[in-house]
Curated annotation (Swiss-Prot):
SMART domains: Ku78, Rho_N. GO terms for molecular function: double-stranded DNA binding. It comes from the Bacteria. It holds the Pfam family Ku. The gene is ku1. Residues 10-193 form the Ku domain. Keywords: DNA damage, DNA recombination, DNA repair, DNA-binding. The keyword Repeat does not apply. CDD domains: KU_like. This is Non-homologous end joining protein Ku 1. With LigD forms a non-homologous end joining (NHEJ) DNA repair enzyme, which repairs dsDNA breaks with reduced fidelity. Binds linear dsDNA with 5'- and 3'- overhangs but not closed circular dsDNA nor ssDNA. Recruits and stimulates the ligase activity of LigD. Residues 256-324 are annotated as: Disordered.
C-alpha cells in the first residue's frame, strides 16, 4: 500500500471531499554508495569552512545570498515566518478544458483517493463530471512548506493531481529556434512523404512495451561481478549519418517503411523465442504461461534463465511426442 503523503480535502463550490494524496510513480534507479577504492570503507561528506577547512556544525550554518554585491544571511526562523502555512484544502477556483493546457506545464503526478467509503459518492461525482466535460480543476495548495499550482483531473477510476510550473518558469522556445519555422519551410512533397512515414509507423500506445534497459544492465553488471563473471560489454551504437539530401532521405525511409510492412520475417515459434529479446512485460507473460513459480521475486537474468530452461523442456517434450 503506497504511503499517504498529504491529507486534506478538495473543495469546489459548496462541496467538500476528504482525500488523501499518494505518489503516482516510483523511481527504480539503482542507488550507489561511495567507498574508498580497494577498501570496504564508506566515504562520508563533511560540511567545512571554505577558507579555514574546519568542519562546521549544522546549527552554525545559515543560508545566504549575494544581493547587489552584499551577502545577506537568512536565519531558518526568518524563512519559517514567511513560508506558506500548511494547507488542508485543495480549493478549485476555476475549471478549464484539459486540451487548453500545454503538457510542458505538468510537473509531477499524484493520485487522490477518497478519505473513506462514505466519501466515494461525492468523489465519483466530481470525477465523472470532469470526465464527461473534459474539464480539469485548477487550484493551489501548500505541501512541505511550498505552494503548488495544481490541476485536478479525471482518470478512468481515480482523480489525479498534477503539480504544475508557474508561467514564469516556462522558457521561451523562440530563443532556441528563432524564425527557423518560417524561413526553412518544407515542400508539399516532403510533407507528404513525412506523413506517409508517420502513418506507416503509427500504433497503439502500450507503455508496458517500454522498459528501463539501462537499469536492467546495471543490475546484470552487479550480479555478474558478484558471481565473478566478466561483465558483458554493450556494443556502441552506430554513428548517426548527416542528412545531406532531405528528399532522398525521406524517399528511402518511405521505401524502408513499405518493405517493413509487407515483408516481415516470420516470427519464431513461441517455444523457440530468444528470451533476451523479450520486453519485461512479455517475459513476465511467458513465465506465467509456463507456470514458473516464484517469478515475481526473480530478477530479469534469473527469469530469462528459468523461461529458457522451461521452453527447452517443453519443446523437447513436444519433439519426442511427434517422433513417437
Amino acid at each position: 500500500m503506497p504511503r499517504k503523503i498529504w491529507t486534506g480535502s478538495i473543495n469546489f463550490g459548496l462541496v467538500t471531499i476528504p482525500v488523501g494524496l499518494y505518489a503516482a510513480t516510483e523511481d527504480h534507479s539503482i542507488q550507489f554508495h561511495q567507498y574508498e577504492r580497494g577498501t570496504t570503507d564508506r566515504v562520508r561528506m563533511k560540511r567545512v569552512n571554505e577558507r579555514t577547512g574546519d568542519e562546521v556544525g549544522y546549527n552554525d550554518i545559515v543560508k545566504g545570498r549575494e544581493v547587489g554585491g552584499v551577502l545577506v544571511a537568512v536565519e531558518p526562523s526568518e524563512l519559517d515566518e514567511i513560508a506558506p502555512k500548511l494547507s488542508r484544502t485543495i480549493d478549485i477556483n476555476t475549471f478549464v478544458d484539459l486540451n487548453a493546457i500545454d503538457p510542458v506545464y505538468f510537473q509531477k503526478t499524484y493520485w487522490l483517493a477518497p478519505g473513506s467509503k462514505e466519501h466515494f459518492r461525492p468523489y465519483n461525482l466530481l470525477r465523472r463530471a470532469m470526465d464527461e466535460t473534459n474539464q480539469v480543476g485548477i487550484a493551489t495548495f501548500v505541501m512541505r512548506g511550498r505552494e503548488y499550482l495544481t490541476a485536478v483531473r479525471a482518470e478512468d477510476s481515480v482523480l489525479a493531481l498534477n503539480t504544475m510550473f508557474f508561467a514564469d518558469e516556462i522558457r521561451d522556445p523562440g530563443e532556441l529556434v528563432g524564425d527557423a519555422s518560417s524561413v526553412a519551410k518544407p515542400s508539399d512533397k516532403e510533407i507528404q512523404m513525412a506523413t506517409m512515414i508517420i502513418e506507416s509507423m503509427s500504433g497503439d500506445w502500450e507503455p508496458e512495451q517500454y522498459e528501463d534497459t539501462y537499469t536492467a544492465r546495471v543490475e546484470k553488471l552487479l550480479e555478474d561481478k558478484a558471481e565473478g563473471r566478466a561483465p558483458e560489454v554493450e556494443e556502441a551504437p552506430a554513428e548517426p549519418s548527416d542528412v545531406i539530401d532531405l528528399t532522398e532521405a525521406l524517399r528511402r525511409s518511405v521505401d524502408q517503411a513499405r518493405r517493413g510492412r509487407g515483408g516481415q520475417v516470420p516470427r519464431q515459434r513461441d517455444e523457440e523465442q530468444d528470451v533476451s529479446a523479450l520486453s519485461k512485460a512479455e517475459l513476465d507473460k511467458k513465465a506465467k504461461e509456463l507456470g514458473i513459480k516464484g517469478r515475481s521475486k526473480m530478477k530479469r537474468a534469473d527469469l530469462e534463465a528459468a523461461v529458457a530452461e522451461s521452453q527447452g523442456s517443453a519443446s523437447g517434450g513436444r519433439r519426442r511426442r511427434r517422433a513417437s
